[in-house]
């Protein structure tokens, strides 16, 4: 996993700035699928019906959701401003077309909505998590409707997506949850620990 992360950082720094949009999207999809494979996550999604310039609207369970969406339909993301300052991950988000939103600032929200609408009008997909936070995946919180406004401004379609994680036996998996007091490190430990348990039970990844 560390090797793939390093490869992703190098690719983002050395290849992305010189790549065409289609090539960047292919790289994002490949890298996201590779990350999911390493973590033993099989993607079951069909967003092929999404026309260019669609807004993907999804619930939010985990930091893995970004890889899930990008593996299915490479998109720009709308994220809270704080993410920009995270070590490594913030830098990666910044060069991966992430649009950062300052919470609580109506003036900034209007500017961001115009920016998102412009991206959609260019035929690029934009993904948003309108709950504004994560849950354990067993329920959906109130949506912040203002995040959907750019699709209306640009006259672009909205593609709803329900994200959930499941065990091989069909039970809902809580290992990827990134809510409450769970840190990024704890979440990753939970996922890796669950992989080891499943391997011990005879599952192959």
Model feature map: region roles:
Residues 42-46, 66, 78, 84, ...:
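Soluble, non-transmembrane catalytic domains of enzymes that act on hydrophobic metabolites at membranes
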Residues 109, 116-148, 152:
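Soluble extracytoplasmic domains of inner/organellar membrane proteins
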């Amino acid at each position: 996993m560390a090797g793939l992360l390093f490869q992703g950082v190098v690719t983002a720094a050395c290849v992305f700035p010189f790549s065409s949009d289609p090539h960047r999207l292919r790289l994002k999809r490949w890298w996201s699928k590779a990350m999911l494979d390493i973590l033993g996550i099989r993607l079951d999604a069909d967003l092929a019906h999404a026309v260019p310039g669609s807004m993907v609207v999804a619930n939010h369970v985990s930091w893995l959701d970004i890889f899930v969406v990008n593996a299915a339909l490479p998109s720009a993301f709308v994220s809270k401003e704080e993410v920009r300052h995270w070590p490594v991950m913030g830098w990666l988000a910044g060069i991966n077309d992430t649009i950062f939103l300052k919470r609580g600032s109506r003036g900034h929200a209007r500017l961001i909505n115009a920016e998102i609408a412009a991206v959609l009008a260019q035929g690029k997909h934009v993904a948003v998590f309108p709950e504004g936070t994560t849950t354990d995946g067993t329920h959906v919180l109130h949506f912040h409707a203002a995040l959907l406004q750019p699709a209306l401004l640009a006259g672009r379609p909205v593609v709803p997506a329900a994200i959930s994680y499941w065990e091989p036996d069909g039970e809902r998996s809580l290992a990827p949850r990134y809510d409450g007091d769970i840190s990024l490190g704890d979440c990753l430990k939970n996922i890796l620990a669950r992989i080891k348990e499943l391997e011990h039970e005879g599952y192959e990844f």
